[in-house]
């Protein structure tokens, strides 16, 4: 798959949410992210398109590991975290930015240009990481925020 974020059209079931096509990590790295996850609010999708353009210009690449989660998927992720099946923190349903189609998780360790450079590009386009470290827990999680506070 080409290293782009392609907007495919509206998701009729979710207000202001669009379907996207992005390189994922599942199966063979670079395959499209599964359709059930590949959704963002329109402004976040447009911003992610710009991120991909800048990453490619910098001679890098970006793979997405997670994006939209339904309430059911979010609750399952939370239960997996609580039980220890997964180590990445996941809040209960109705408490995740993934459910609002405003969050992405990236492969922070395979970018071709370093996570610090990718973080700068993401920040430039409104994607904010919730932790300061480039290697610690949740360093892969970015939330789209249209306003800078």
Where do the language-model regions lie?
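Catalytic cores and adjacent binding grooves of peptidoglycan-active enzymes
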Residues: 84-149
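Acidic helix-start/capping segments at beta-turn-to-alpha-helix junctions
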Residues: 63-78
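Active-site acidic/histidine clusters and adjacent loop/turn architecture
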Residues: 9-66
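Substrate-binding cleft of extracellular glycoside hydrolase catalytic domains
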Residues: 3, 75-88
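N-terminal secretory targeting signals
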Residues: 1-9
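Stable alpha-helical elements in mature extracytoplasmic
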Residues: 40, 44-51, 73, 77, ...
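Sec-exported extracytoplasmic/periplasmic mature domains
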Residues: 53-57, 79-83, 123, 127
């Amino acid at each position: 798959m080409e290293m782009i974020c392609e907007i495919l059209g509206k998701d009729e079931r979710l207000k202001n949410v669009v379907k996207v096509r992005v390189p994922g990590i599942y199966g063979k790295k670079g395959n499209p992210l599964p359709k059930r996850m590949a959704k963002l609010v329109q402004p976040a999708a447009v911003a992610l398109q710009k991120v991909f353009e800048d990453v490619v210009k910098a001679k890098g690449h970006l793979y997405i590991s997670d994006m939209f989660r339904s309430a059911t998927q979010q609750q399952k992720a939370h239960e997996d975290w609580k039980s220890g099946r997964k180590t990445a923190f996941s809040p209960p349903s109705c408490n995740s930015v993934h459910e609002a189609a405003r969050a992405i998780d990236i492969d922070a360790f395979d970018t071709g240009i370093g996570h610090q450079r990718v973080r700068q590009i993401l920040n430039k386009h409104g994607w904010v990481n919730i932790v300061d470290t480039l290697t610690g827990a949740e360093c892969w999680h970015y939330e789209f925020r249209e306003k800078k506070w």
